[in-house]
Amino acid sequence: MIKYSNLVIPKTKSILKSGCNNNIGYGDRYFFNKLFGSNDASDTHNQPTTKIVTKEMTKELKYPVNQVYSVIIKVEDYKEFLPFCLNSTILKREKDKNHFEAELEVGQGTIKESYVSKVVYKENKFIESTATDTPLFHKLINTWSFKQGQTPNTTIAHCKLIYQFKSPFYATLMENFFASSLDVMINSFDKRCDELYGSSNSFKK
């Protein structure tokens, strides 16, 4: 359930497969879209009015590439250490494939939302997560790339976040959260590496 102040909005899970009719006229989705922005492309009055935002950050971590990659690819563990991740589940994974589907429930304060992402990866090289459908975003893509650091057993990790809200209201509401989201993610993954592989915790620019 999504809550804002005294307003209570029934939460709908954003699991829409290709080819499904998303032009829903009644019910929870209709009410949510009217408040936060419709994802019906046929409605010209509800086309994107918010800007696409890109944030990037590069850090050198004191762990080898395979260890850093191993922590970030385990999406099902995110709920254990990412502050804004309330739940994380693998929905579909095929053997010997370089992709899987995961559902994340994220939130800040009284606002919570679940969405499904398709995660594509190449071992020890990159991980890209794309939200397949969510009532909050027109676009949400998170990409990680990895290479060996300048000293042995270190990793240069580059994180890129691209997002576009469906509603100016929600963009304003979540602006401060997303402004610090990369710092939060990278520091959380660094601490997770400490828990699994070591005891010290530091970043080098």
UniProtKB/Swiss-Prot annotation:
Cellular-component GO terms for this entry: mitochondrial inner membrane; mitochondrion
Membrane protein topology class: Peripheral membrane protein
Keywords assigned by UniProt, alphabetized: Membrane, Mitochondrion, Mitochondrion inner membrane, Transit peptide
Entry annotated with the keyword Transit peptide: yes
Localization per record: Mitochondrion inner membrane
Major subcellular location class: mitochondrion
Domain of life according to the entry: Eukaryota
Biological process, per Gene Ontology: cellular respiration
Matching Gene3D superfamilies: 3.30.530.20
Gene Ontology MF terms: ubiquinone binding
Entries under PANTHER family matching the protein: COENZYME Q-BINDING PROTEIN COQ10, MITOCHONDRIAL, SPERM PROTEIN HOMOLOG
Function: Required for the function of coenzyme Q in the respiratory chain. May serve as a chaperone or may be involved in the transport of Q6 from its site of synthesis to the catalytic sites of the respiratory complexes.
Known partners and oligomeric status: Interacts with coenzyme Q.
Family: Belongs to the COQ10 family.
Protein name, per record: Coenzyme Q-binding protein COQ10, mitochondrial
Organism of this sequence: Dictyostelium discoideum
Annotated gene: coq10-1
